[in-house]
Amino acid sequence: MDSSTSLLPPLGSIILACEGLTSLVPLILSVLVCLVATVTISPTLLAYFNDPFELRAYPGPFLAKFTSAWISWIISQNRWSETVDLMHRQHGPIVRLSPDHVSVASPAAFAAVYGHSSGALKAPFYNAFANFKTRSIFNTRDRAEHSRKRRVEAHMFSPRSIRALEDTARVHFQVLVRQWDALCAPTGKTGRGSAEGTLGTISWKVHGDRVWFDCMPWFNFWSFDTISDLAFGRPFGMLEAAKGSAHVSKSNTKSVQAVSQDTSHSDEAQSELLEIPAMEVLSELLDFTVALAYLPAWVQPVFGRLPMFRDGYDAAPKLANLSLTAVANRVASQTDRADMLSELLRGRDEEGKPYGLEELSTEAELLIIAGGDTTANTSCATAYYIARDLQIQAKLQAELDVALDGVESDVAPYDAVKDLPYLDAVINEGLRLHSTIGAGLPRVVPSGGMTVLGQHLKEGTVVSSPIYTLHRNEAVWGKNACEFYPERWLEASADAKKEMMQSFAPFSMGPRACLGRSLALQQLHILLATIFHRYSLVLENNAPAQLPLRDGFARKPMKCIVGVQRRK
């Protein structure tokens, strides 16, 4: 026998050894499962019995006492706001949502948690929203950093700055009107004479004297094009194409080089483009992020790679690239055009420092998220309520007919509609019943604790107060709190109106309130006035009693089929 061969173990010995190991596999797996369970469950049970935040006395779902997985599961099922509201109806104004988190529901509680004197900071929940290393004004948890950003960005959303952008925004209202006019032509679409068809990605059909289509995508096309033009100097082109896609650079590196004003790469970055379904990407990313945000930080990367979260996980770099490409295109244009990015480029903090590449990119991404989705959601929901009640629609149209009599433009001028009592009431009611974010956004109780509704919450406790429940409080809004009733804003006494305003927070309140409030209100006034002055909208006979929603981070309408007709 060869000497080298004699050094090898006999084949039979190897087989026996392998068989021995194979027989141990079930035991090894059992040990591993026990170890994982011990590592996962032991701290949970220990925290429950130690009760470090003294929350055991507060009612809530059984699983919520032990784990944040309960609230994450509810969010992943698109039932966040409504489920928390149900918990409050069952258990009262204070409900436990996780081992360290309570939800408090009342006007006084909302002010205590989010008001200027609160002292509470944003919770670790917001860490999940960081798509860049540098935080945005939305997801930063540092008070000093937020104050610095607010000083730089507040001017961008001042009433004067917003009014200066009205002419730019008007273009996209005009495109929306042109597209809807084409759909409303006698044949349903210009010259075809067909009873049904498609315009871009939107299916339509003619039935009776109306054209029927889903209006939700149109509101998204409009809002994405408007914010991209106002922020970056050019629209994504969704309205013209009737398609929810945008073009991004194939290379993040080239986008970064362009944003860094390395002009040798600017043309190259713009020429190599990839089309992505931007609207879908944004929805997937928000659903993915908020579903994981309440889980422990070490769990999030693991869960993020599960098949059920794959689309959301893949959406993050796509949205980052969308913001990088938008900034790169704007920088490469070298225009002196006044827009939001020019305000960010000129902005300086108290030390005279401008925003760097990372900060520009993360704030650009926030503009796309906030401007591309939130106003569209509220617009669609409000249109749904108006189309559902033809008496409300007729009353609104009568007011608009007087206010816009003699106006030649197809688009309602803001000055002509900004102070119309019934339109204001309709918009307020839409924001009340369908504030884009209905859930309570979490804060951390500061040093020294916090007293809410007579209960002392210890330092480090996570606390939130849900807008959805605040806006449906029957003690304030009456027995018809869940109904769309604009007249409540006109019929209330001075004292009742004051109480209503204290319970009305569609843009939140305090130092972290939405900076884009003025822009959102301007856009809502122009959009709803333009649509309902020009068109009549109705719902299908078999329309759902409630607008179907994805109730995650944003309360996003899934579909809203309307029959549209040009008014005579």
UniProtKB/Swiss-Prot annotation:
Glycans are attached at residues 321, 377. It is found in: Membrane. Its EC number is 1.-.-.-. It comes from the Eukaryota. Its cofactor is heme. SUPFAM superfamilies: Cytochrome P450. The keyword Metal-binding applies. Gene3D superfamilies: Cytochrome P450 (1.10.630.10). One of its GO terms (molecular function) is iron ion binding. It is a single-pass membrane protein. Cytochrome P450 monooxygenase that is able to use trans-stilbene as a substrate for oxidation. Belongs to the cytochrome P450 family. This is Cytochrome P450 monooxygenase 89. It comes from Postia placenta (strain ATCC 44394 / Madison 698-R) (Brown rot fungus). The gene is CYP089.
